[in-house]
From Swiss-Prot:
One BP term from GO: response to nickel cation
Note on how the cofactor is bound: Binds 1 nickel ion per subunit.
Keywords: DNA-binding, Metal-binding, Nickel, Transcription, Transcription regulation
Record-given protein name: Putative nickel-responsive regulator
Sample GO molecular function, one term: DNA-binding transcription factor activity
Family per record: Belongs to the transcriptional regulatory CopG/NikR family.
Pfam families the UniProt entry points to: NikR_C (PF08753), RHH_1 (PF01402)
Protein function: Transcriptional regulator.
Family matches, as NCBIfam families: nikR, PRK02967.1, PRK04460.1
Keyword DNA-binding: yes
Organism per entry: Pseudomonas putida (strain ATCC 47054 / DSM 6125 / CFBP 8728 / NCIMB 11950 / KT2440)
Highest taxon above the source species: Bacteria
Residues reported in the UniProt entry to bind Ni(2+): H76, H87, H89, C95
Length: 138
């Protein structure tokens, strides 16, 4: 096993610490490993060429330099996947976007990752559902 260093904001660290306390982990490392494993399982659930629908949601700080423009460009570059998008102004500095996507699992995963790794995106989640007629993932 290798030791690594990561940087987390205080709020995220508080969430992890609460998870450690409430779920009985021995420490942060095991809790973070479990979260990473769950995220990797979710992203590997469907073959890249499987047809699916998905909901991607993310909260971001719209004052982050050029972030709204970059997010918009990313969505436009994948316009063929986007069925609908909802944009909500949560407060003076934060927006929530929810997009319904349809297409191949690999392309949807790529788009979701591009959106969520942008600096200034604070929370992101994607839920992928096999399209009607596709085999269910176990």
């Amino acid at each position: 096993m290798q030791r690594i260093t990561i940087t987390l904001d205080e709020e995220l660290l508080d969430v992890i610490d609460r998870r450690v306390a409430t779920q009985g982990y021995q420490g942060r490392s095991e809790a973070i490993r479990d979260l990473l494993r769950a995220g990797m399982r979710e992203s590997e659930a469907l073959p890249d060429d499987a047809a699916c629908v998905a909901v991607v949601s993310y909260l971001y700080d719209h004052s982050t330099r050029e972030l709204p423009r970059r997010l918009n460009q990313t969505l436009h570059a994948h316009h063929d996947l986007t069925r609908s998008t909802l944009h909500v102004h949560l407060d003076a500095g934060h927006c929530l976007e929810v997009s319904v996507l349809q297409g191949e699992s690999g392309r949807i995963g790529e788009l979701s990752r591009q959106l969520m790794v942008e600096r200034g995106v604070e929370h992101g989640q994607v839920q992928v559902i096999p399209a009607p007629g596709q085999p269910k993932v176990r």
